[in-house]
Every structure is written in structure tokens, then in C-alpha cells.
Design a protein with these regions (language model features):
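N-terminal Rossmann-like NAD(P) cofactor-binding subdomain of oxidoreductases
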Residues: 1-186, 204-210, 278-282, 325
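Predominant activation on well-ordered alpha-helical scaffold segments within soluble catalytic domains
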Residues: 17, 137-144, 192-196, 244, ...
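A short coil-to-beta-strand element that immediately follows conserved catalytic motifs
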Residues: 28, 151-155, 210-216, 256-260, ...
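Short, solvent-exposed beta-strand edge segments and adjacent coil->beta transition regions
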Residues: 123, 181, 227-231, 287
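Short Gly/Pro-enriched turn/cap motifs at secondary-structure boundaries
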Residues: 183-187, 220-222, 265-269
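C-terminal substrate-binding/catalytic lobe of Rossmann-fold NAD(P)-dependent dehydrogenases
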Residues: 189-259
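C-terminal active-site/capping subdomain that shapes the small-molecule cofactor and substrate pocket
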Residues: 230-326
Length: 326
């Protein structure tokens, strides 16, 4: 597969390049960055020293590639496509939020393989899910299939600083972020609609009607670089053994999403494309914990997973990664 990358200078693009350089079926044809054209990739992504001598380019030779990854900031992908024509035979995987929500004229398939694998396999265009959205909905989807989410869901999730992107800002500065934490966008985070969209899809397919509960989501900024750890609380009288069995069955064929019987932590998933999930019951309250690496399963790892599915190769190819901590 010949690959083009647009918006090649950010954190997500750097991770994408790292994954693709080690992917046995991938060949990077071009990495576009207007601001870095002519510079070596390693001038920006210094962790790739010794792995590539590619340079950034201002060119976009779409006729020479099979698939293009959009690593733009949110809102820029749709604007780009209005000004540039990409050949119909070239597949697109967009990592921004522009096409995640279904609407008239949007042919992008929502790129969560755990529920949309068959559609992704036939898709020409895929909208890669958001990082918080991935972690939270993977924690809740089996509960939606069970039909037990009939009350508001309390969600808390903390993310690493790379989730804010490469551009420096007041809340990403080391002196502020280190030994600190804070909330942002409480009850109004942009990922909530896509979470509800997927929960509605699964709940309807299971014959449990429309999803109408509120996702009361409080996002937190953490003082670490990578990872998302989320808790989701659902009220239900269903016994824990039945819930665990349903979770294991839901993800039985998912190569990266796993229900585990012990409590989970971030170090088990950082630098991998995995999502780990654990459930506990306290009275009528079901506590679900889920965690991912925000740059991998929450971004480019899932994007490459989608690419693999789109081209009919092994879903985990190039993504058999070891956690960085142990």
C-alpha cells in the first residue's frame, strides 16, 4: 500500500509515521507539511532518527498513492476537500472530527472496528473516532447492547498532555501541567455526540430502542504525556456475572479490545493499540473502567487498524506493540 500523509508535523502524524515505517505492507510515498517543506522528517520527529531519511514536501501527488491520512486540526479536512480533488480510487482516513457524525451527503464510515468492521471493509472514506470517544464508548457499548443504560451515565476521564496537540499553550506548558490537574469542557465536550451516536446504533440493533440517556462527562487534564483512563457509572440490577459474560462476548473477536478480570491501569496500554476494560458492581451501581493510549487506539493506531481492514489484510498488522512501561 502506498501512503500519503497530510499535516505531517504534529504529534499524531509523528506516531503515524513511526507505525507505518514498521508496517510490512506500507510504503510512505509523501508526507506533506507546508511549513516544513524540504526539511527532514527527523528535524521535527526526532524520535525517528536512524529510521528514515524522508523529507517533508509541499507536493501532494495523490495519483501515486492508495490511501491518504488526514492529520489536520479539527475543521480543516472538510475545507481542504472543498479546495482539492482527490482521485475517487484513493481511500481517505480522516483523523479530525469533521466527518464523524452522520449527516446527509456524508459517506464517511465511522471508524470503530469493534462495531463497524464490515462497513469499514467496504469503505472508501473513514472518519477516525476521537480519543475520549473511543475510550468511553468501548467501555459502554456492551451495556448498551444489554439495554441497561436507562438512566444518566456519569463519566470521568483523564487524558495526557499529547491530547492537546503539539502547539504550545497555557495548559500544556510543563510548569503548569506538571504536578497539576484540572477539568475542561464539563458536560459539553465535543466527543459526546459521537459517543451517543454509537451507543444508539448498538442499542437499536439489539432491539432495545433509541439511546436517550445523558452522558454526563467531565474531562480532566492529567500531568502525564500519554493515555486516557475513564470511569463510567451505570445503574442496573443485573448481576455482575451476567454483565461480565456479556462484555467478554461482545469483544470476543476484537484483536485490541479486551475485558480483563483484574483492575486496570494506564501502564498496561501506553504505547499499544489496546483498550482494556474492567467492571465491578457496588449495589445497583456498575462501575466500568476503560483505558487506552490516546495517540494510538485513540488516534493513529486505530487509523492504521482501519487501513488494514479497508485493504483486507490482518487487522493487527504493524500494531503488535509492547507497552512502554514494562
Amino acid at each position: 500500500m502506498k501512503i500519503g500523509i497530510l499535516g505531517g508535523a504534529g504529534y499524531t502524524a509523528g506516531e503515524l509515521i513511526r507505525i507505518l515505517l514498521n508496517h510490512p505492507e506500507a510504503e510512505i510515498t509523501f508526507i506533506n507539511s507546508e511549513s516544513n517543506a524540504g526539511n527532514f522528517i527527523t528535524d521535527v520527529h526526532e524520535g525517528l532518527y536512524g529510521e528514515t531519511d524522508l523529507r517533508f514536501t509541499s507536493d501532494m501527488p495523490f495519483d501515486d498513492v492508495d490511501v491518504v491520512f488526514f492529520c489536520f486540526g479539527h475543521g480543516k479536512s472538510e475545507a481542504f476537500l472543498k479546495e482539492h480533488k482527490i482521485p475517487d480510487n484513493v481511500k481517505i482516513i480522516d483523523l479530525a472530527q469533521d466527518f464523524r457524525l452522520k449527516r446527509e451527503g456524508n459517506d464517511y464510515v465511522y471508524g470503530l472496528p469493534e462495531i463497524n468492521r464490515a462497513d469499514i471493509a467496504k469503505a472508501q472514506h473513514v472518519a477516525n473516532p476521537g480519543c475520549f470517544a473511543t475510550c468511553i464508548q468501548l467501555g459502554l457499548l456492551p451495556a448498551a447492547k444489554l439495554g441497561i443504560i436507562d438512566d444518566d451515565v456519569s463519566v470521568n476521564a483523564i487524558t495526557g498532555s499529547t491530547g492537546a496537540g503539539q502547539k504550545p499553550g497555557a495548559t500544556t506548558h510543563f510548569s503548569w501541567r506538571n504536578n497539576n490537574m484540572s477539568i475542561y469542557k464539563p458536560f459539553q465536550h465535543q466527543h459526546v455526540p459521537e459517543i451517543c451516536q454509537s451507543l444508539n446504533q448498538v442499542q437499536q440493533l439489539a432491539g432495545n430502542g433509541d439511546f436517550s440517556a445523558s452522558i454526563d462527562f467531565i474531562p480532566y487534564r492529567g500531568d502525564f504525556a500519554r493515555g486516557i483512563f475513564a470511569t463510567e457509572v451505570v445503574k442496573t440490577e443485573l448481576p455482575i456475572d451476567d454483565i461480565v459474560a456479556a462484555y467478554k462476548d461482545f469483544y470476543h473477536d476484537a484483536p485490541f479490545t479486551h475485558y480483563v478480570d483484574k483492575p486496570i491501569d494506564l501502564k498496561q496500554v501506553v504505547n499499544t493499540n489496546k483498550c482494556l476494560i474492567h467492571c465491578e458492581k457496588y449495589g445497583n451501581k456498575l462501575l466500568i473502567t476503560s483505558c487506552i493510549d490516546n495517540l494510538l487506539k485513540g488516534a493513529v493506531g486505530q487509523a492504521v487498524q482501519n487501513m488494514n481492514v479497508m485493504f483486507g489484510i490482518e487487522e493487527d498488522m504493524g500494531l503488535r506493540l509492547k507497552p512502554s512501561a514494562f
